[in-house]
Amino acid sequence: MADENLQPVFQIQRVYLKDLSLEQPNSPAIFLEQDAPVIEVAVDVGAEQLAEGLFESTVTITVTAKINDKVAFLVEAKQAGIFEARNIPDEQLDPLIGIGCPSTIYPYLRANIADAITRAGFPPVHLSEINFEVFYQQRLEALAQQHASNGSGIVMPDGSAAQH
């Protein structure tokens, strides 16, 4: 029976849209513009330990569309998920929380952003796939630079180690 309790567990508890904002500061005049918008996309990833074995993972994306230096729209959305991860070694837990969880919730975020932009009266912006391993590696490098030796080994959005 004790062996069963030590089996690795990883499952999604919930996926939810944590924040969504849309701004159209130059409407309705912007709809009369004939030029194609220039799209800028910014991405951020976060993680927080909620309780023993429970983690919240977030992906935030800001999409800004400009036509002739005027903002057509700005959408910022944060998709989150609560994940249960128990009996997983730190060397496997870190990549799971830093890479696997964001990869799981990102498709929901892409759909929500495309829907918000379409409902605002613009053609949808189809966000490309993201390699979340790059974000994870950047955070590991930041953590190594800070020489943080105490913590759970989970790298937080600011590059610090999560504390137990």
From Swiss-Prot:
GO CC annotations on file: cytoplasm
GO biological-process terms attached to the record: protein folding; protein tetramerization; protein transport
Gene3D superfamilies listed in its UniProt record: SecB-like
Main location group: cytoplasm
Keyword Protein transport appears in the UniProt entry: yes
UniProt-annotated location(s): Cytoplasm
Keywords, alphabetical: Chaperone, Cytoplasm, Protein transport, Translocation, Transport
GO molecular function, one term: unfolded protein binding
HAMAP family: SecB
Assembly information from the UniProt record: Homotetramer, a dimer of dimers. One homotetramer interacts with 1 SecA dimer.
Protein name per Swiss-Prot or TrEMBL: Protein-export protein SecB
Gene coding for it: secB
